[in-house]
């Protein structure tokens, strides 16, 4: 059994009726085998008083850093990410019509592997900023459904790391 004790965490509760003092309180977080066991102040002292063998507990001092649930990106086009790097894909005028034209030309020769490779880079960047839930649109105007196939494969491959919801576009 693995046990971690995260001490000195600033917990963002966001609970209705919470006072400023309650939402700013420093708490400790006890995790056993990847499951939250307890969130309370002074857990280390409590565990020691209960006779817990602290030698087997990994203690991480968060130094008052904010701890909150992961973020959700509710509108992303993972099949489009980094396509502007392809020759001829840049929307020079910045207009919607040119953007649509450039994408139409760019997607014609995209492969499942290429979309997955670029999407993985985009997902990694999202995760580094605290995002764990992503709702991505998939272009379904391609008769081969290349984008949809790529993103559905990626959803399955990354299911233990990030939650992907795929919607058609």
Residue ranges of each PLM-predicted region?
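N-terminal metal-binding scaffold of metallo-dependent hydrolase/deaminase domains
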Residues: 1-52
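Generic structural signal for residues in well-ordered beta-strands
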Residues: 16, 59, 164-166
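Short, conserved beta-strand segments within well-ordered enzyme catalytic domains
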Residues: 30, 38, 59-61, 73, ...
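Short, ordered loop/turn segments at secondary-structure junctions
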Residues: 42, 83, 138-139
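Active-site gating loops and adjacent loop-to-helix segments of metal-dependent hydrolytic enzymes
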Residues: 82-115
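Divalent metal-dependent hydrolysis catalytic cores, especially in the metallo-beta-lactamase
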Residues: 98-109, 118-146, 159-169
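Acidic (Asp/Glu)-rich catalytic clusters
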Residues: 151-161
């Amino acid at each position: 059994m693995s046990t971690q004790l995260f001490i000195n965490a600033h917990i963002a509760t966001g609970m209705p009726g919470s006072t400023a003092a309650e939402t700013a309180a420093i708490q400790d977080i006890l995790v056993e085998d990847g499951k939250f066991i307890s969130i309370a102040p002074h857990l280390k002292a409590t565990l020691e008083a209960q006779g817990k063998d602290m030698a087997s507990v990994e203690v991480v001092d968060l130094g008052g850093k904010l701890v909150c649930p992961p973020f959700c990106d509710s509108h992303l086009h993972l099949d489009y990410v980094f396509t502007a790097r392809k020759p001829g894909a840049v929307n020079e005028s910045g207009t919607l019509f040119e953007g649509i034209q450039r994408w139409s030309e760019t997607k014609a020769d995209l492969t499942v592997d290429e979309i997955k490779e670029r999407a993985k880079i985009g997902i990694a960047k999202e995760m580094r900023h605290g995002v764990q839930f992503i709702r991505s649109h998939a272009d379904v105007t391609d008769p081969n459904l290349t984008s949809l196939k790529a993103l559905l494969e990626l959803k399955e491959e990354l299911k233990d790391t990030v939650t992907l919801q795929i919607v058609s576009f």
